[in-house]
Amino acid sequence: MTMSSSIQKWPGLSLFLPVFFAVLIADQISKQIMLDLVFNPPRYIEIGSLLNIVPVWNSGMSFGMLADGGLIVRIGLTVLAFAVSGWFFWMLPRLERLQRLAGAAIAGGAIGNAIDRLRFGRVVDFIDFHVGAWHWPAFNVADAAITIGAGLWAFSILF
């Protein structure tokens, strides 16, 4: 069975896989560049009045939640990332196009952060968005993809 015949037999794969791998690869490459550029030695780079590049190790999940959870949380979040990604893949034939796109973004981001947890025991964050003195918690490409994917998923359900 060739790849093209597999794609034809599994509806949505031709959209899911490119988006999934684009998110995953962009996330991992950006994190490696940031590890080399701003993590060792730690330094801060101002990009403009709204954006900085900063070195942040996140041992929890979004916004640093569950950061003190230790090994159990790390394992749980990693298992959850693979479970959610597997669910999206399994559900592909039943999903609408926008949901496939959203699922691919969420899965790619989830696996990107899971790879960090497996490699480092924590996640590499480096994007610091701020308005004046108010700073959004540092995030990465995977987090952005998960957030965009969740927004697209919600939109697909509501409209």
Language-model regions, residue ranges each:
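Alpha-helical transmembrane bundles and membrane-interface segments of multipass inner-membrane proteins
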Residues: 1-159
